[in-house]
Amino acid sequence: MKPLLLVLALCGAQVHAHSVGLRPDYNDYSDEDTRRDWLPEPLKPVPWQSETRYAQPQEAVVQAPEVGQILGISGHKTIANRPVNAFLGIRYGTVGGGLARFQAAQPIGYQGRVNATVQSPNCAQFPELDRLRLSESRGENVDDCLTLDIYAPEGANQLPVLVFVHGEMLFDGGSEEAQPDYVLEKDVLLVSINYRLAPFGFLSALTDELPGNVALSDLQLALEWLQRNVVHFGGNAGQVTLVGQAGGATLAHALSLSGRAGNLFQQLILQSGTALNPYLIDNQPLDTLSTFARLARCPPPSINPSAQGLKPLYDCLARLPTSQLVAAFEQLLLQNEHLGLTQLGGFKLVVGDPLGFLPSHPASLATNSSLALPMIIGATKDASAFIVSRIYDQLARLQSRNVSDYIDVVLRHTAPPSEHRLWKQWALREIFTPIQEQTASLQTVAPGLLELSNYILYRAPVINSISQSYRSVPAYLYTFDYRGEHHRFGHLSNPLPFGVDASLSDDSVYLFPYPPEASRLNPLDRSLSRALVTMWVNFATTGVPNPSSGVWPQATSEYGPFLRFTNNQQSPLELDPHFGEGIYLPNYRVIYKPTTNFSPPITTTTTTTTTTTTTSRPYAYNPYANWQNRPSQQHPNWHPADPEYVRAQEARQQEFIREREQRRREQQLRDQQRYPQQEPREQQDERIRQQREQEERLRQQREQEERLRQQRELEERIRQQQEREQYEREQQEREQREREELERQQREREQQQPEQQPEYNPEPVNPWGYPVQEPQPDDNPEDGRLPYPSYEQYGPEGNENLPETDANRNFSEEDREQQQQEQLRREQQEQQEREYQLQLEREQQEREQQERGQQEPGPEEYPSYEEYSRALQEKNAERDRIYAEEQERERQQQETLLQENQQHPEQSLPEEQPTHPNYEAYDGDRSYAEEQEREQQRRDQVEQEREEQPDEDQGEEYERSPDEEEAAEQDVLKVEDFPSYEAYLEAATKLREEQEEQEKLEEERYRAQQEEEDRIQAERERNSRN
C-alpha cells in the first residue's frame, strides 16, 4: 500500500509541475487579443509582487583555489521568492604606497580566508574627504581600494554575468550603486567594480612613473580575476557583458577598443557614454599635471620634461598624503569649472599612455571593425541638462537678439575649440530657424541649445562610435525619453524655462534601486523597469534584446532605427529611424582614416518593425511642444503576420535610404560651392585672430610694465616719506638743542646784568621797580578786601629771572635778532608741516576713492594703449599743476611774512603765553605814568562806590595759594613738550576749554556770593527799619 501511495504522489507532482510550468517571471494574460504587441515577450507573474525581504546574515562559503575560502552573506536578500547571496569587498588587486598610487596595480595572490560580508570603502574621492582624513589619522590604508561585489542567486550554475562599471564623471561613485533588487529577478550574476578615480586613475605625464589610464588597468585586472574565479560563484566566464553608465560607459568602450581585453568580455551595454565623448579625453595632460602640481604645492614640470626634470615632482607626489592630493584635485575642478567641460582635467583618458590602452585617439580605433563588439548603445533624451542648467546664468546675462551669441557660450562649455565652427554651422542649419537668428531670446532658443548640447556630448559620439562597426557586429540603438517619479540626480531641478524629460543616468534608476530614495517605484515605473531589465538580460544571455519579437531590430545605419522609451501608455516602446539624421559634422571618418578594411554588410532576416515618420529636421522648432498630444506611432492595421504591411515597411525603408543619400549628396554639393567663398573668409578670420592675439600680448606686456612702474612709484613714495620723517625728527632735535642753548645763554645774561647795572632809584622800590606807596585811605583794614587786585598778587614767586618780570630790563638788538631767527625757524617748520599735511590729505583721498570702488579706469577701458597713456599723462600733468600752484601760494605767503617782519621788526616778536603780566605790551618805555593815572582813577571810582554803600561788607582779598600758582605754571603749554604741532594744538584747545569751564564755575560762585550778600544787606535794612 505504501509503495502505491508513493507512486501516486510522484505522478501528481509531475502533473502539477507540468500545469504550472517553469518558475514564473512575469504575469500571464490569458486573453491573447488584449496582450500588447510592444511587449518583448509574453508577460509572466509580477516579480515585485511582494517587497524584498532581508534574511538574517548567514555565511555563504565559496572555495576558490587561487583565492581561498570566501565567506559571503547567505540569503542577503530574497528576490522573487529566491534567496540571493552577496559577496562584498573582495580584493582583486593591490596598490602600493607613494608614487605607486598612480601606477598599475598588481594581482593579489592567495588570501586564505576572505571576509566578504562587509561593504568596502570607495576609492579616494573629494566628496569623502573627511572620511579619508579620519582614516589617515588612524593609520589606515586608504589607497588599497580595488574590490568588487558579487551577487548570485542561490544555486547559480553557468549563468551569464553582468559587470557594472559606475561612472558619471570618473571622480566619484562606487560599487554600491549596483544593487541586485531588479536585475536578480532574472537568471544572471551581477558584479560591481571599484576602481581608482580622479588623479590616482588618470593623472598622467605620459611616463612610466605617471602613465595615466590606470583606471583601465584596474578594470582589466578585475575582469581577469573574474575569468579565473567567477565559475566558483555560478557564473559563465564565456558570457560576460560589460555595462557602463556615463563615464563608466566611456571606460568600458575604451577598454574594448584597446585590443587588450581579449576574451575578458563578449558584449557591451553603453548608457549615455562612449570613448568618443569629447569631455572625457584630455588633450593637454601635461598642462593638467602642471596646474595640479601647483595646487598641491609641488614643483611643476618643465616645458620639455625629462625623466631627471620630473624627479622633484615625483618625489613630492610620493610624499604627500592621499587626502591632500584629493583636496588639490578638488581645487583644480573649482578653478577651471568656468572654462567648460572640455578644459577640465585630472579625470580623463589620455592618448598615447605607456600602458598601451589608447595608442591613438579612440575615434581612430573605432574605425577598426576587428575591435568591435556587439553592443546596446544609447543615451537619455536630455542627458546634457546638467551642463545647460549650470551655464544658464551666463546665457541669461547675454540678453542678445542673435542666436549665435548663445551658441558660442554652449560650444565653449561642451565642444573642443577645433569643432566650434562646424557645430555652429550645423546648429544654424538643423536646429534653429532663420527668424531666430535675428530675433532670438533665451526663452525661445533654450530648447534648441539643450538639443545642441545633447548632440555634441552624447548623440554624436554614439553615431560616430557605430558608424563603421554596425556593418560587422550587431548594434542596437535606443533613446530614453521616459520621465518617471524618481531621478538619479537633481538636474531636473534647474532654472530652465521648460520641462526636462530624462536627464543623465535616469535610465539607471530603473536598472538598479539607487539612490535609496528611488527604490520604491510606482506601477508605471515598475512596468518600464521590467521591460528595461528584460531587454538588458536577454542581450546578456542571447545577444538579442527581444528574441521572440521584432520590436527592436538592430541598426542598419549609424542613424538607426532606434528604440525610444516613452511615457505613451498605449505604446511605451516606439521605433524611430531618425536617431540623429543630419549630423555630418565633425566627420571622424575623414579625420581618422580606417585602420582595416570593412567587411561587407551582413544580411539579416526581415523582421516586422514599427516606425515613426519624422521630417529631415526633427528638432528644427521646439521639440518639446505638444509632446503629450503626439499621435500614436503605431499603424492601426499592423499585425506581424500581414505580408502586405511587411512589404510596405520595406519599401518605406528603401525610400528613406534613397532620400537620405540624396540629401547627403545635395549637402556635399552646397559645401563644395561654398568652399571657395569660405576659404578667404577663413584666412581673414585667422589673420584677425592673430592680430588680436598680438594685441593681447602687447596689452599684457604694457599692463605688466604699468604694474612695475606703479610698484616703483609706491616704493619711492614710501622712501620719501621715511626720509621726510627722519628729517623732521632731526629738525626737532636741532630745534630742541637750540632752544636749550638760548635758554642757557639767557640765564647767563640775566645773572650778569644785575651786577653791571647801577642803582638809579634811591627810593625804596618793590621787586617790579614801582615806588613803595603809602596805604591808600580806601583800604579797609577791617575786612581786608580791596576794590581791585593789588600788584602784590601777581608777584613773581620763584620766577624773578624771567625777562618779563625784570622792570629794569629792555630788549636788546641781539635778543630781537635771536627772536626773529626763532620766528623764521618756526615759520619754516610750519611750512613743512603744512606740506606734509597736504600730502597726507591727498593720500587719504586716494584711499577713500579706492575703498568706494572709484578706481581709475585701467588700460582695458580705452580703445588703445596710446589713448590710455595720453589720458594718464593729462591726469599727472593736472596733479603737478595743482601741486605747483600750492607751492607757489606757500612761497608768496612766506615772502609776505618776511617783508612784514623787515618793515616792522617789533611786531615779529614771538607771542608767548606769559606766566605773569607783561607790561611792555602796554608801555614800551617803562614810564608807568599812564598806568599810575589809570590806577588812581580806578581807586577813585571804587572809593565813590564805597561811599554810596557804606554798610556793605567787604570780602577777603583773594590770594593765590602756592598750589594754585604751581597749577597755573603747569597750565602753560610749550610746543617742545609735544611730539607734533597737531598734538600741541589739541592739548591747547583742551586746556582752553577746561579754563573756560573753570571760569564759568567761578563766575557762578561769585554771582551766588553776591546774591547772598544782597540778601543779607536787605535783611539788615529791614531790621534797622524795625
Curated annotation (Swiss-Prot):
Residues 723-752, 811-854, 867-893, 923-944, 1002-1026 have a biased composition (Basic and acidic residues). Residues 945-969 have a biased composition (Acidic residues). Residues 1-17 form the signal peptide. Pfam families: COesterase. GO terms for cellular component: basement membrane; extracellular space; vesicle lumen. Residues 601-641, 659-695, 723-1026 are annotated as: Disordered. Disulfide bonds join 123-145, 298-316. Extensively O-glycosylated and also N-glycosylated. About four tyrosines are sulfated. Residues 625-636 have a biased composition (Polar residues). One of its GO terms (biological process) is synaptic target inhibition. The keyword NAD does not apply. Glycans are attached at residues 115, 368, 402, 810. Keywords: Basement membrane, Calcium, Disulfide bond, Extracellular matrix, Glycoprotein, Secreted, Signal, Sulfation. Residues 603-615, 855-866 have a biased composition (Low complexity). It is found in: Secreted, Extracellular space, Extracellular matrix, Basement membrane. In the N-terminal section; belongs to the type-B carboxylesterase/lipase family. Not known. Binds calcium ions. This is Glutactin. It comes from Drosophila melanogaster (Fruit fly). The lineage of its organism: Eukaryota, Metazoa, Ecdysozoa, Arthropoda, Hexapoda. The gene is Glt.
